[in-house]
Amino acid sequence: QFPTDYDEGQDDRPKVGLGARGHRPYDKKKEEAPSLRPVPPPISGGGYRARPATATVGQKKVERKPPDADGCLHADPDLGVLCPTGCKLQDTLVRQERPIRKSIEDLRNTVDSVSRTSSSTFQYITLLKNMWKGRQNQVQDNENVVNEYSSHLEKHQLYIDETVKNNIPTKLRVLRSILENLRSKIQKLESDVSTQMEYCRTPCTVTCNIPVVSGKECEKIIRNEGETSEMYLIQPEDSSKPYRVYCDMKTEKGGWTVIQNRQDGSVDFGRKWDPYKQGFGNIATNAEGKKYCGVPGEYWLGNDRISQLTNMGPTKLLIEMEDWKGDKVTALYEGFTVQNEANKYQLSVSKYKGTAGNALIEGASQLVGENRTMTIHNSMFFSTYDRDNDGWKTTDPRKQCSKEDGGGWWYNRCHAANPNGRYYWGGAYTWDMAKHGTDDGVVWMNWQGSWYSMKKMSMKIRPYFPEQ
């Protein structure tokens, strides 16, 4: 960048008075000090002679004798000597030679100085021209850069305008819709929680009317003309006390005693040995507008009772399940027995039929070899997180199927089916949602895999009898 002495189109600036240097200020750092030019010598040589004096009237004219000038005298005495002699001329030239030589030398010096000054001036002018060209190139480059930045700014401005006018409102509408959806779900969950809190405010009791008809199990009740699916009292043995169960009188000709039911996650199945032994949960609730308990709740009938019922004679087990799309499958085992507590409620199942996959006998169909064998449930002991009877043989007490998979069950190492696992809304879940990072949902691997928790699952038993 160089300072300029030109206005460069700044005609619109306010006019100010010029200083002593006008518009060319002297910059001591960038300019040489100005030098004075030599003074030229005075002009020498002859001039006019003095004018003759004019005689006044009456004045006597005096004859003037011209001096001897070593030359020829003019005929007219007033004109004096015509020309000097050679010697006189030589003397005159000699007298005038020195000042003339000095004047010539001075002139030569003056010419040299003027030449040097002209060369410096030319160089300065050339420098100014180059500076001017450089300034013009800079101005052009700056204009190009400004134009380029202006183009970029215009594009960014258009993008911002487009984003602000279109994208952001669209995203805001989407977010608003999501928030409304979440608000609706939260309100529903709050309502469900309030309902469950009302259920759990006091120990679970049944306030429904219980039918008079009874029997040792639900098959006997249907044979005694108890045809409605609801809660009944059964008494397997005369020596035992009657207890409540839910009887399914519609599925596969009815007569099914429900020993387990999952449908809404309202009951925690992560319990100790004694609750699983005795049973827990809500057997049934009253149907809307009806005075009987026609809606099954979530419950586990109890290992002692299940063992008692299955040891009364050959027993079938029907497992029904439903996913979150409403699709349903079943697993029917025509042989089902649970041993007593002394034998750790050991499981025995046989003769599978159905559409869900034979998870209890064959293990997880996705696995092969030893890995599949470790998921077979048949012949396993019952385990809870405080009574470890599973098939996972490890010295690490933390490695326990019931603790990691959320419920009590006939675990191997660990499961292909997990009906008593943790309840996950929506079906699909991931390891980071699980308490221990395991597939701890209400799982039937042979149908929906490890990471899908069923919406509904129930286990029902009925005495075996020949079909007509």
UniProtKB/Swiss-Prot annotation:
UniProt biased composition (Acidic residues): 1-10
Protein name: Fibrinogen beta chain
Keyword Coiled coil: yes
Modification sites for Sulfotyrosine: 6
Signal peptide: none
Expression tissues: Detected in blood plasma (at protein level).
Record remark on domains: A long coiled coil structure formed by 3 polypeptide chains connects the central nodule to the C-terminal domains (distal nodules). The long C-terminal ends of the alpha chains fold back, contributing a fourth strand to the coiled coil structure.
Residues bearing the modification Pyrrolidone carboxylic acid: 1
